[in-house]
Amino acid sequence: EATDIQIALSKLNKTDRIIVSLCVVEGYKSHEVGKILSMNPSTVRTRLNRGLEKMREYLEVQ
C-alpha cells in the first residue's frame, strides 16, 4: 500500500506534491506552508484538498 501511495503522490504536479508532503507527512499547517512557498494559506488548503482528491481517485482505480 505504501508503494501505491508513493505512486499516487508522484502523479501530482511538483507544487501539489510538495504541499501534500509538507502538510500530511511533515505535519506543517497551511499558513506555515504558505510562508515556505510564498502562497496564500487558502491557496495551500485548496491545492492540498485537490491533491488529496486526485490521489484518492488514483488509489480507487488500483
Language-model regions, residue ranges each:
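IQ-motif-like calmodulin-binding regions
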Residues: 23
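Short alpha-helical "packing" element that flanks the helix-turn-helix/winged-helix DNA-binding module
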Residues: 5, 19-20
